[in-house]
Amino acid sequence: FHTDSASQGFIAMASVPDWWHPGLELSLRGPLGRGFTLPASARRVGLVAFEDSPSRLRGLIQPALKQEAAVVLVCNFAPANLPDDVEVHPMSALQEIADWADYLACDVDRENLHRLRERLGKLNKLPAEGGTQVLIHTPVPCGGIADCGICAVRLKSDWKLACKDGPVFSWDEVG
């Protein structure tokens, strides 16, 4: 999974399949739903990858650094080619980073959402209201067109479709 910052957001894409060749016609859709919203006031940004790879969070790094924020990545497997300004901490440091951060972005697969709720629910403190956002990774086979419900996520008050209402949700909705 590759991400790279662009002037008005970021580009995210999976690896290109081997059978693709120059001149191949592609049909692309997107973007779908709602993405991360990095507050302009954020100066201490924590990126928390509950899955094996923090790749879906990488698109927040350059915008955060551009606004002179300190960036800490919390994950079990540190990726290569991170900017030198990004600190990497193990998941065991989550409490310390949550206490420090004024903005927290988390990435979790829908199947592991209960683990995230359990883990964040035990923390003494999270960034102020709206300061914690969660990317819930789930299949979106219809591309957000058919309201098929396969991407549905159970939040505190209701079911939401990741393709339209997410896939990034405020912790206030999730927790």
Residue ranges: model-predicted function:
Residues F1-L24:
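Ferredoxin-reductase
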Residues F10, R34-F36, F169:
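Aromatic-residue hotspot detector
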Residues A14, G30, D165:
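Pocket-edge structural micro-motifs
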Residues D18-P141:
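FNR/FR-type flavoprotein reductase catalytic core
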Residues A40, G144-A146, D172-E173:
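Solvent-exposed, flexible loop/coil residues
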Residues H137-P167:
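Local cysteine-cluster metal-coordination motifs and their immediate loop/turn environment
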Residues D165-F169, E173-G175:
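Phosphate-binding loop/pocket of nucleotide- and phosphate-handling active sites
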